[in-house]
Design a protein with these regions (language model features):
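Conserved beta-strand-loop-alpha-helix hinge in the C-terminal portion
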Residues: 209-231
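Conserved ABC ATPase "signature" region
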Residues: 102-128
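H-loop/switch region of ABC-family ATPase nucleotide-binding domains
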Residues: 189-190
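Conserved ABC ATPase signature
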Residues: 132-136, 140
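Catalytic Walker B motif of ABC-type/P-loop ATPase nucleotide-binding domains
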Residues: 157-160
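Q-loop/switch helix immediately C-terminal to the Walker
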Residues: 82-103
Length: 231
């Protein structure tokens, strides 16, 4: 359900939103009454305990955004028996013909290889493109998943814990890279310091509700403790 509020002149265009929406899975309602508006140019970090509904909300956003959204799922969504190159290439499968995709599977297209090599280099994956993904470390697999989303070249980056398996310094570098290439991002994270440092707006979820929705510069890590308090 999309909110149809009047947009004030000078207000960034709304990209996606929910107006008293019910979100969940089959018989399991995760958000019984969710109202949220996301505008162009926002960089949003979604925080909250495991199982609180971050992926559920990202899925609903993806459905609204369609081919505007570059999707970076958790690293285990890669195809393990294919090479890093082919997993990244899959980000743009729909852009090429079936015939081109088939040929590329056997013999990588030179232009695609060059573009993906350059992208892989910025992500510290040089030399690993031919390696099967299940022979990469967890952090390397995560960078392949990010590369695949960046290769989609879509306006909005939607990431489900894209830096969960890397150290904080590398996480910061990867988030910078994502921000450089995407004006608008919505990313689920567990690292609150990274959220405060790299995003403009923090949305904190708990118990089927948004309990924090504030500019990052107004919050401290302690303000986010409430999201992780034991039951
Ligand atoms: N396919 C599904 N069918 C039914 N319930 C589901 C399904 N996927 C998730 N859930 C439930 O919905 C709730 C929210 O799950 P979700 O995956 O959105 O949480 P999350 O915050 O992304 O968790 P995590 O940080 O562990 O990835 C959980 O209670 C989960 O068990």
């Amino acid at each position: 359900m999309l909110e149809t509020a009047t947009v004030e002149p000078g207000t960034p265009a709304m990209l996606a939103g929910f107006d008293h929406a019910r979100l969940g899975h089959d018989h399991h309602i995760v958000f019984p009454d969710l109202t949220l508006r996301i505008s162009q140019g926002e960089r949003i970090a979604l925080l909250g305990r495991s199982g609180v509904g971050k992926s559920t909300l990202l899925d609903a956003l993806r459905a609204q955004l369609g081919d505007q959204g570059a999707w970076c799922p958790q690293a285990n969504a890669l195809v393990p028996v294919l090479s890093a190159y082919h997993n990244i290439y899959m980000g743009r499968l729909a852009h090429f013909s079936r015939w081109q995709n088939l040929i590329n599977l056997l013999r990588p297209n030179r232009a695609c290889w060059q573009e993906i090599s350059a992208l892989a280099e910025t992500l510290g994956l040089d030399g690993l493109l031919r390696r099967q993904v299940d022979q990469l470390s967890g952090g390397q697999q995560q960078r392949v998943a990010i590369a695949r989303a960046l290769y989609q070249k879509r306006p909005v980056f939607i990431g489900d814990e894209p830096v969960a398996s890397v150290d904080p310094r590398q996480g910061a570098r990867l988030l910078e890279l994502i921000n450089e290439r995407h004006h608008t991002c919505v990313v689920a994270l567990h690292q609150r310091e990274l959220a405060l440092a790299h995003f403009d707006r923090i949305i904190g979820l708990d118990d089927g509700r948004i309990i924090i929705d504030a500019p990052a510069h107004e919050l401290t890590p302690n303000d986010l403790d409430v999201l992780y308090a034991p039951d």
